[in-house]
Amino acid sequence: MWCDTIPFMHDSHVHLTREPLISNLSEIIHSFQDKGGTYILSQSTQSDDFDTNLQLTTLYPAVIQAAIGLHPTIFEDISTKNTYEQKDIFIKGEREIKLFEKYVQKHNNKIKAIGECGLDYYQFSLNESYSKETKEELKEIQKISFRKHLQLALKFNLPLSIHVRDVADSDECVRDVIRLICEEGKGALCGVFHSYTGNMSYLEEILDLGFYIGFNGIITYKSGENVRDILKQTPFDRILFETDGPFLPPQSVRKNGHIKEKFAQPADIKEIIETASQVKNITYEYLEKSSDANYSLLFL
């Protein structure tokens, strides 16, 4: 039984190749271990960081595991100065997708997950210069990319780390993610919806598909009531913890005037679990052990 095992605190979603984490990696890892941490799943977001991310697993083989994937928002970045022609979006986007596919095929035995991947309709909505046509093209290339991630996850029996972010008062993005999962491999795919902040009404459907939910520093924010509500409704056997570092530092870091550079790191998992245990009205020890067991089932 998992309740008899020794806890091994995990960070199921962090970007160790990003600054300032990568430049302070030794200190970051030691701080995590000092707080009882054992496993870190480091996420890729674009082809430029694939090699670096995989190399980290050889530097700290007992601690760091690698997820390889393309973040959906990179398709805005691949065209210079956010100036688009249709051919640029699809030619450059599909080139990046092919690089990802070849990399996973070559290194799948060293990879623990496919990610970070998914759909994001929020980010490009902020750019008022985009035409409706451009926005639809960005949605389409994101879907093409996500399908490829799902297909490779099936082919190599790897879990997914899924990003989904909707425009306010919309559920189009999460509906598309769920639809694509069902079309490509309902019942055969597994993974985690990382940092899910979407509509609560889709939680049951996500869980029914066999996926987990990743919770991070947002649950410590005053503005995180929606995510705390999602946590309350998520069963213990589907909860994972993450930092999404260097993004989303917990409240204690955000409000600390003595900390000049505010970022999230794996050691912050302890504070996140402490907050989650209060939300779930359960002991820290129980929640840590149950979530560690979930990590083990999915990624080890």
Task: Name every feature range the model reports, one short phrase each.
Residues 1-300:
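Mid-domain alpha/beta scaffold segments of enzyme catalytic cores
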